[in-house]
C-alpha cells in the first residue's frame, strides 16, 4: 500500500527485484519521471536535480512492468493538481498490456492527499472498491 511518493515506492517493490508483494494498493501514486507527466519534487528528492535521462527512464515504473508484476488497484482523483492522474493511467495501461489484473478508480474530486480522511466525499466508495477487489483477486 502506498500513497503519492509512497505509491512510487510500493510500485517499485512490485516492478524491481525478485521479491514482490502479492498485490499493490496505490493511492494517487507517483509512477513516471517523464517530462510533463511527473511530480517533479518526488524525482528531485529521489535522484536530485542533476539526474540523467537514463535515471528518469529507470524510475519510470510504467516501463518496468512485466508479466511477473503483481496485480494492483489504483485510486485517484481527476482533479489532482499535485500528481498528474496520467501517472496512474500509465501504470494501469502497462499492467493491462501484460495481462495483469488491475483496477482503477477515478473520483471526480478530492484533489491530492485524501487518503483515509473522513471528509473525503468518496471514502465509503473507495473502501468498498478495495475490499471488493481484494476478495476478487483471492477467489
Protein language model annotation of sequence segments:
Residues 1-42, 56:
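Primarily recognizes the serine-hydrolase "nucleophile elbow" in alpha/beta-hydrolase
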Residues 49-64, 69-70:
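Active-site nucleophile elbow and catalytic-triad environment of alpha/beta-hydrolase enzymes
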Residues 30, 78-80, 108:
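Residue-level signal for short, function-critical loop segments
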Residues 8, 76, 112:
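Histidine-centered active-site/metal-ligand motif
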Residues 68, 73-76, 80:
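Short beta-strand/loop motif that positions the catalytic acidic residue
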Residues 81-90:
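Conserved alpha/beta-hydrolase "acid-adjacent" motif
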